């Protein structure tokens, strides 16, 4: 069997994607471990300027509501949850607020939700 010409590294590709998203001046990265080292999300933001990162407390519903507000103001928040099971705690703001905005108005908010399953 032939070896592939190159190998993809998940961490490197995720870091590259976050760096690409950061090129847009209205993109903000919101979540835990965005400004302070400690978990994998910090490592993947190495190409993102600190002024585009917002550190949040452990309050997932607050984080999703905050991102909804940022989107209403024209920003493109990337809401980062360290693990997928924490996303369950943000479902109220996601399903009852963010999801309804387009139906209640002509506005289409842009929010990117990023979470991880497994380890990097």
Model-predicted segments: where are they?
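Thiamine diphosphate
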Residues: 1-120
């Amino acid at each position: 069997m032939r070896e592939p010409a190159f190998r993809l590294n998940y961490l490197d590709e995720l870091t590259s994607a976050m760096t690409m998203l950061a090129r847009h001046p209205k993109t903000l990265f919101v979540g835990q471990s965005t400004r302070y080292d400690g978990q994998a999300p910090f490592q993947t933001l190495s190409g993102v300027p600190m002024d585009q990162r917002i550190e949040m407390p452990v309050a997932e519903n607050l984080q999703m509501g905050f991102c909804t507000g940022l989107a209403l103001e024209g920003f493109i928040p990337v809401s980062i949850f360290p693990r997928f099971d924490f996303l369950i705690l943000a479902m109220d703001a996601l399903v009852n607020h963010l999801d309804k905005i387009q139906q209640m108005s002509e506005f289409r908010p842009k929010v990117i939700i990023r979470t991880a399953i497994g380890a990097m």
